[in-house]
């Protein structure tokens, strides 16, 4: 029997359309599937995302077992664990799919040099993105794009590969399996009790895609902004851990009976993910440093009052129902509707003047789909300090946003049942309701539901004055 190949899984917890797995199969070699919990060289995933990862690893292990293989689990420094496994199994090669953030790039570069010095063949592949983050560049300046629209146009002009590789139903096994740690399960943080709606793993990702293409994508271009409608793909957590490839999303959506408008909008959302990874690759300090340096001088609020406001925002007790509904959805489900993410992020940054990095860290901790590129790039976009960022004067009015995008109040009342008796404008600004209306709705401001922690017009003008001074 030929020597095995170690396939090191990381952010690619699937078998189909996995280029490292494909290369192993094409080499006709036994596969040793490896996952290393390396917390030293990667930004530690938040509690909810770790919960998802552990569920996904179990699904991957089960699928490998059905196909005559196993998942080998190790923990600790990746270089040390790889070298130890090499000593145990004498492989002909080590394959992996590339990651694109600074810590992983530095680690992988060092490991590749070390293994090559040991005469071990090392190959890496792109199985995470449609394009490598260095691939699409401005033709005029030969530099990375800083604006999304021309970037995505260049991607489409280049052409998107939609060929899908399907994994075999049976893998070659090594003559002897190495030892593996047992799978562990991360406990969910306090308050996260409604995650049974998800099915982590490759099979769950495929089901989610097929449900989206058969039902929710119709009317997606407009409906995706309304949080009460089932009009989003809900694929983000599956993409986060590589349970499905963006190439498959493109291929299957292209083949589905979908309107051009809905298809174009969905593809653009995949494009934003590509743009975020390009931005992160070329700006490795993205999670800590504003892309526009002038924003480093922004006078963020600090002190006891700001801390109280930050806690109110995290807990969904700001007194602005659409913001609070989103923050409670996040706490309970590990997810927040995209439109509401923008509203909640804008409120923290522009109403409360609290550093976007603190909001990014909270989303990182509580989102199942907390992605190293998307999460940071999105927060910088809302703050106005990132690539192709929202203009500083775009300050969402949370009252109007609620009325416009949750007109029946179904989403808001789902997460704030104490306001079930209110409707229309009063639902989104209960402090303006007359006392008899509040009494009939069984709402006691300051007791059953909080009063606003800041007045909108005051907060808006305060933020505009500061942003204008920086502009």
Predicted regions and their residues:
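Bulky hydrophobic/aromatic packing residues
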Residues: 48-55, 73-74, 95-100, 125, ...
């Amino acid at each position: 029997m030929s020597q095995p190949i170690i396939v090191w899984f990381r952010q690619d917890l699937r078998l189909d359309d996995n280029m490292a797995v494909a290369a192993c199969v094409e080499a006709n070699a036994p596969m040793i599937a490896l996952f290393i919990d390396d917390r030293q060289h990667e930004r530690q995933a938040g509690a909810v995302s770790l919960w998802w990862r552990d569920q996904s690893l179990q699904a991957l292990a089960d699928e490998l077992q059905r196909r005559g293989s196993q998942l080998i689990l190790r923990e600790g420094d990746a270089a040390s664990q790889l070298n130890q496994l090499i000593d145990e199994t004498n492989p002909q090669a080590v394959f992996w799919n590339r990651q694109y953030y600074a810590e992983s790039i530095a680690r992988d570069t060092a490991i590749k040099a070390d293994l090559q010095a040991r005469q071990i063949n090392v190959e890496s592949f792109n199985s995470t993105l449609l394009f490598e983050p260095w691939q699409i560049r401005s033709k005029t300046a030969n530099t990375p794009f800083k604006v999304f629209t021309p970037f995505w146009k260049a991607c489409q002009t280049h052409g998107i590969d939609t060929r899908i590789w399907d994994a075999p139903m049976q893998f070659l096994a090594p003559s002897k399996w190495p030892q593996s740690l047992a799978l562990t399960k991360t406990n969910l943080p306090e308050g996260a009790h409604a995650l049974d709606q998800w099915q982590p793993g490759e099979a769950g990702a495929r089901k989610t895609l097929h449900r989206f293409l058969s039902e929710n994508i119709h009317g997606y271009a407009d409906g995706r902004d309304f949080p009460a409608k089932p009009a989003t793909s809900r694929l983000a957590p599956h993409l986060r851990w590589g349970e499905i490839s963006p190439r498959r999303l493109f291929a299957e959506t292209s083949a589905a009976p979908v309107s051009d408008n809905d298809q174009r909008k969905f593809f653009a959302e995949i494009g934003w993910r590509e743009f975020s990874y390009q931005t992160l690759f070329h700006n490795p300090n993205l999670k800590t440093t504003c892309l526009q340096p002038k924003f480093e001088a922004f006078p963020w609020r600090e002190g006891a009052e700001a801390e109280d406001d930050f806690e109110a925002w995290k807990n969904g007790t700001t007194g602005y129902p659409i913001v609070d509904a989103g923050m409670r959805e996040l706490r309970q489900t590990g997810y927040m509707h995209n439109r509401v993410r923008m509203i909640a992020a804008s409120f923290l940054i522009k109403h409360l003047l609290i550093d976007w990095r603190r909001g990014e860290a909270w989303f990182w901790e509580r989102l199942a789909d907390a992605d190293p590129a998307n999460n940071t790039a999105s927060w910088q976009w809302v703050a106005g300090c990132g690539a192709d960022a929202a203009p500083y004067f775009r300050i969402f009015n949370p009252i109007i946003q609620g009325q416009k995008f949750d007109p029946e109040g179904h989403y808001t009342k789902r997460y704030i049942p104490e306001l079930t008796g209110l409707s229309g404008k009063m639902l989104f600004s209960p402090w303006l309701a007359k006392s008899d209306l509040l009494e009939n709705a069984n709402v006691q401001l300051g007791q059953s539901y909080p009063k606003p922690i800041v007045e909108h017009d005051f907060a808006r003008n305060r933020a505009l004055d500061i942003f204008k001074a920086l502009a």
